[in-house]
Amino acid sequence: MKQVEAIHTLRRWSLRDRVIFTHTDLRKIFARDKEPAFRAGLAALVRAGFLRRLTRGIYFYALTDKPVPHPLEQIAVALRRSCYNYLSLESALSEYGVISQVPLAGITVMTTGRAGLFDTPFGRIEFTHTQRTVANILDHTRDVGRPLPLASVKAALRDLRRVGRNTHLVAEEELAEVHPDDG
């Protein structure tokens, strides 16, 4: 992998608003390289600061000249690409204004994949496993024009109660006033 060619390739991807990559994505982008050359090239791009390792197996093209919208959500999608994921728990309830504190350090995501915590330079991503069916997830989330769908108020509250934490932060009166018919 020649560094100049790699930078040009990554720049072309960034023009299409793609700046967060998995290791597998990069391997496909640079498929012509033999494995040792790919590994060496990837390490050189990271060392030179052109790519930034965000967490294990996730990289960010650092030369982008555009702001990255919802980077934590993009990283979450990349980390659990083969799973159904949605913004829920404290993150969703905060967006709806029915929780008394705003989560500042990261996002809370429900996933059909494995639970886990990932610390990145953009903040923390907390995955909580759900056994909900895909149909149930689709019925209780909505597309809000971002990488992750958003749980309905009722679903986020149900998720919060199911995991058994921070229920004391929910302003029940606000929930009843603002979202009486949410489903």
Could you say what each language-model-derived stretch is?
Residues 1-9, 176-183:
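Surface segments flanking catalytic/ligand-binding clefts of nucleic-acid enzymes
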Residues 2-80:
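Short beta-edge/loop segments at beta->alpha junctions of small alpha/beta modules
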Residues 62-183:
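Nucleic-acid-binding surface
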